[in-house]
């Protein structure tokens, strides 16, 4: 009796050929594996050990939004892995305007081995994956930011040595993609994620339902609250993001609503961990912590504020890990790219992790 045909990818890797569109597309164990793989690749980079897992591959980088960290991370990660990255910006490619997303996906899939997309619509990135026939990586949409999550939890694991049982508190706009991704990913990995925000800016019921479903298995305790003291108590990680994205019109309303939620040294003291080495601050950047930017000057002129989501004192303090976190974007993206495109031998991932 002949054996059924089994492809190399099926034997060798649980990741090969897969897209990362949202964190929930992968299992908690797979997300943790990517975190650990990112740490491994970071060590190889620091020791100048080559890791050309994507030699000869061509990768399309599609950007509808401006980007510093995501573009730089994907570009350097691809080059380190031996691949050729090709940047296509908003003026180069306009999905759904002159050509449908389906048609564009089919064309790009015939020329490139994988596609990264940083844009607005989650459906758009899902359609790219559906029709291109190659792995697609979500570099950010309005709903999710999965590549950021691997970097973030890499940073947490670097600082604490483990994930399960830690408490990460996100303070600010609880409806944005960062809050969505943090509470879902944390619940997958056994991290207690608290969203501390005004009631009108709490995560949607759909997002909380996803988080709670994962939390039932991991033991995490996700929470959304407007009470700052309750929300930050016991925090190991205080996390922030910008209050208003560039191009949005409701600055005044949002600034008034969120000013009480600015991260200060006093807020860090409320955690109870400010003096025992069990607290760090993280921010996905860019941050409005001073007036050294055009936007910072505009905010000061309009609202009289020299700081927004975080004070300059916290941003420059011993707790701050935002630049380490930013560097980890490259290593984590490298892990995602290599795992899903590199034909690596990963037949299974450990279900138990800490």
Swiss-Prot record:
Key words, A-Z: Arginine metabolism, Cytoplasm, Transferase
Residue intervals passing through the bilayer: none
Its EC number(s): 2.1.3.3
Matches recorded under Pfam families: OTCace, OTCace_N
Residues that bind L-ornithine: 177, 241, 245-246
One of the record's GO molecular function terms: ornithine carbamoyltransferase activity
GO BP term (any one): citrulline biosynthetic process
GO cellular component terms given for this protein: cytoplasm
Catalytic activity: carbamoyl phosphate + L-ornithine = L-citrulline + phosphate + H(+)
Pathway assignment: Amino-acid degradation; L-arginine degradation via ADI pathway; carbamoyl phosphate from L-arginine: step 2/2
Record carries keyword Cytoplasm: yes
Keyword Cytoplasm: yes
UniProt: carbamoyl phosphate binding residues: 67-70, 94, 118, 145-148, 284-285, 329
Top-level class of the enzyme under EC nomenclature: transferase
Subcellular location: Cytoplasm
Summary of the function given for this chain in its UniProt record: Reversibly catalyzes the transfer of the carbamoyl group from carbamoyl phosphate (CP) to the N(epsilon) atom of ornithine (ORN) to produce L-citrulline.
Similarity comment text for this entry: Belongs to the aspartate/ornithine carbamoyltransferase superfamily. OTCase family.
Descriptive protein name: Ornithine carbamoyltransferase, catabolic
Organism: Lactococcus lactis subsp. cremoris (Streptococcus cremoris)
